[in-house]
Regions:
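N-terminal glycine-/serine-/threonine-rich beta1-alpha1-beta2 phosphate-ribose binding loop
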Residues: 1-113
Length: 113
């Protein structure tokens, strides 16, 4: 069955704020490459993986706007980032995800435990 995302999201009045954990693997790359095509329904809010620099380089390679990038190491950093227009929060610590105000979290680590 082929999924037509345009049809699926057409009546959605709100843009979902999405986060991804395990972003630097193959599934994460594929997902992040698709998000800009769904900008009417999805906005990338958080990318979380073990290495912030690798995450930043991945986003740059996919042509995300680097002015949106906010490396965050604690809750205060996240609070400051959320005051900006359409931030992409970059984390290494998954325990900070609850502070990021996301609607959906994509688990792409390959180890969901």
């Amino acid at each position: 069955m082929l999924m037509n995302y345009s049809t699926l999201f057409k009546d959605n009045a709100k843009v979902a704020q999405v986060g991804i954990i395990g972003a630097n693997g193959g599934f994460g790359y594929s997902f992040l490459a698709q998000v800009p095509r769904m900008q009417d329904s999805l906005s990338l809010r958080v990318i979380c993986d073990l290495d912030m620099d690798v995450s930043r380089k991945l986003l740059e390679s996919l042509k995300y706007d680097s002015s949106r990038f906010h490396p965050c190491r604690n809750q205060r950093d996240i609070e400051q980032a959320l005051k900006t227009d359409d931030p992409i929060i970059i984390l290494e610590d998954g325990t900070l995800l609850p502070f990021c105000k996301i609607d959906v979290l994509v688990e792409a680590t390959g180890s969901p435990e």
